[in-house]
């Protein structure tokens, strides 16, 4: 099976006792189109790579007219997504691998699950699995350099996104029966990208946590304390957001001020105006009056 999947002729696909296809679906400018690729995967994955729209765009850092120019997608990450799907597909289910290209992301779907551990354990590059679902296939793909030899593939995808100041990949839509990789190809929150651009020595761990914040996903209390201490985030859980430093850099000062809330003098002025109208206010009324004016981290 390994030989047929990687280097077998298309006309020999019938010798396999399962489907061996990658379906590419593309959603662009209101149109939907695509293609179907089969064996030999060592060649057809490169053909599919050539169909994916990839281009450079600019990110302007704070107080500079010289932009950072980055690729929408990292070529190695695209191939990693496809090759991992081939390597870890549960072929007994007789299902196809699906690559979906949207305007701002790529999605890779294959049947099966993470054979050992959770994807988050592989982000730092420290975990090495003890066994694989398709050992012969994986060994062959390692030998011809289709996949990483030290199981750094997921780590390298995350590092590449950080190095290009883009949102992190995720497997959040995965289930017990299917692995789904989402690879962003555009900016979600400009503040996040400018934060990475201004702090290129930021650890990958911090970048992943900051990515969780920009996507509105929960992070642990310890992570919140860490990011807050480093001046990367502000706000009151669950309403976390980037710090004032980045807000100024991206013309979101008004939005930041609303999240930051009024200062003491402004709150006092607000109370006095209310007293001029109502003459008397109880504590409960004052609390209600000021609650939406207080900062999220009050």
Question: How does the language model describe each region?
Answer:
Residues 1-298:
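C-terminal regulatory or interaction extensions
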């Amino acid at each position: 099976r390994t030989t047929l999947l990687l280097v077998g002729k298309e006309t020999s696909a019938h010798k396999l006792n399962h489907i061996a296809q990658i379906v590419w679906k593309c959603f662009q400018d209101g149109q939907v189109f695509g293609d179907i690729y089969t064996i030999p995967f060592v060649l057809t994955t490169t053909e599919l790579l050539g169909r994916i729209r990839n281009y450079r765009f600019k990110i302007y850092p704070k107080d500079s007219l010289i932009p950072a120019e980055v690729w929408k997608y990292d070529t190695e990450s695209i191939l990693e997504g496809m090759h991992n799907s081939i390597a870890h597909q549960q072929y007994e289910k007789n299902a196809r691998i699906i690559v979906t290209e949207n305007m701002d992301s790529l999605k890779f779907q294959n049947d099966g699950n993470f054979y050992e551990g959770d994807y988050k354990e592989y982000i730092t590059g420290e975990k090495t699995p003890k066994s694989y679902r398709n050992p012969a296939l994986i060994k062959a793909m390692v030998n011809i350099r289709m996949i990483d030899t030290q199981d750094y593939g997921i780590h390298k995808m995350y590092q590449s996104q950080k190095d290009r100041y883009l949102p992190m990949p995720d497997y959040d839509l995965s289930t017990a029966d299917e692995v789904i990789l989402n690879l962003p190809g555009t900016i979600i929150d400009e503040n996040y990208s400018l934060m990475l651009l201004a702090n290129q020595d930021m650890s990958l761990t911090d970048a992943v946590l900051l990515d969780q914040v920009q996507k509105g996903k929960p992070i642990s209390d310890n992570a919140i304390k860490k990011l807050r201490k480093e001046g990367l985030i502000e706000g009151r859980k669950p309403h976390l957001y980037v710090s004032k430093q980045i807000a100024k850099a991206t013309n979101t000062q008004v939005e930041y001020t609303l999240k930051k809330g009024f200062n003491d003098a402004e709150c006092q002025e607000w109370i006095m105006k209310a007293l001029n109208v109502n003459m008397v206010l109880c504590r409960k009324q004052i609390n209600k009056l000021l609650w939406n004016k207080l900062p999220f981290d009050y």
